[in-house]
Amino acid sequence: MKAKHIVKIEIKCQSADEMLKAKSAVLYHLETLNPEFQANENVLTVTVPTLDSKLFYPDEACKIIHDTLAQSLTFVHEWTCTLHNIN
C-alpha cells in the first residue's frame, strides 16, 4: 500500500541541543512510522508517510501524531503538525 499523504512536523529550535532533544522525542514516539528528518538552520522538519486505511483516515493520523508529540515537545517554543496530499 502506497502512502497518499504525509504528516509534516516543523519544529523551531533555539539551539543545536534543543534540536537533538526534539529529534530524540520524535524518534521515541514515531520510529516505527519511518520518519524522515531534515535540519535547516534552526528548523527541524520531519515527514511521516501515512497509509490510507479503513482504520485511520489521514486527518485522524495527523491528529494522533500531533497529540502524541504535544506531550513530549513541551520544551520547544514553536512547532506545527500538518497533513499534506502527495498525489
Question: What residue ranges belong to the model's regions?
Answer:
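Mature extracytoplasmic or otherwise solvent-exposed domains
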Residues: 25-28, 36, 84
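Short, extreme N-terminal segment that most often corresponds to the first beta-strand
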Residues: 1-22
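A structural detector for beta-sheet-dominated domains
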Residues: 10-14, 47-51, 84
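A short, charged, amphipathic alpha-helix used as a generic interaction element across diverse proteins
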Residues: 19-28, 65
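Glycine-rich beta-strand-turn "strand-cap" elements at beta-sheet edges
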Residues: 75-87
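A general secondary-structure signal for short beta-strands and their flanking turns/coil
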Residues: 2-6, 41-43, 76
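Short, intrinsically disordered low-complexity segments
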Residues: 32-71
